[in-house]
Amino acid sequence: MHRRSFLYRTALVSIGSFLPFWTRAGSTEIPSWESLVDWARWAPSVHNLQAHRLKIVSETEAVLCYDPKFLLPVGDPNSDFNTAVMGVFTESLSIAAAHYGFAVRKTEIIGKLDHTMEEIMPFARIELVPAQRKEPLSRQLLKDRRTSRNNYDGKPLSALTLNACEDIVNAFEGQFFSSEDEDLIDYLIKINQESLFEDLNSQPMREELDGLFRYSKKEAETHRTGLWTKCMGFPGKLVKSVFRHHNRWVKGARKQMLKQYYRGTFSGTATVGWIQYPWTTNEDKFEFGRMLCRIWMQMANDDAYMHPFGNLITNPSAFEKMNNTLELNKESAAPLAFAFRAGYSKQPPRSFRIPTNKIILS
């Protein structure tokens, strides 16, 4: 097991104060918000629901909004993780803007994500400013990045990638850990599997997930939001049966078959990682999202994939087991905020996205 040191290794991932920098010598072109959203819309979001919306105020100012229809009253009742996604989307806009020598930054959080709202609501003000530094992450990574939920090839994540990810976390004042210990990996996969079946036993959770799964390419292409079962590595008919005929899968041979099938999608996992990060305020969660975006893009840059262990964070019993098992900095008040597996696999399918003109508000 490895705990990465608290050192900034290179300027590659420095997130410090900006000083003017132009990626194109002499360029004064201000990119349109539409052009930036066209790249940033490929950013990851919770269950691919894409709640983010953008209200343009001027060529350099906008209001980041959210559509409450795409929040999760059961799975994310306080919208903690969707708040983080607002940070992911903002950082994606910034990476896209770097192509023109600009960056996008949040100036003020003006609202709180609330699934009880009935209309699109504001969350934060953002602005387009001259970049302070050269952006090491290409905007093409926003489209190249994918989540691989399939089996990996058994190779541990490279030390260079782990070091780069640690530097990113350090720059955001978090703490990064990773492990290649086979027993620990097997244990995390085991409790992840247990938490899945525990969640499936909850009718409200089943109904919420059933409403966001897309069981065929036609459904996925029509909605352009939600979890396409092909991206989950499961046949659509199987997943639909599990959610809509749950009693058939709670015992006996079918339950064992489902367990083995799900376990098989984790084969070849040779690296797991986790992050301690402040998780009290909306600012904390937003900044976590910015950090997570950069980690994910770094993985894509290095031809690696990451698969978050979402259940291990949101399921209380699984979280307690994991929290009591993993190496953590006990002197830090920051909680365990994120866990994942990472490695190398065949290129997974890409989820659909809603078009730019649906994200930008009129």
Spans of model-derived segments:
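Acidic, surface-exposed loops and disordered segments
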Residues: 2-362
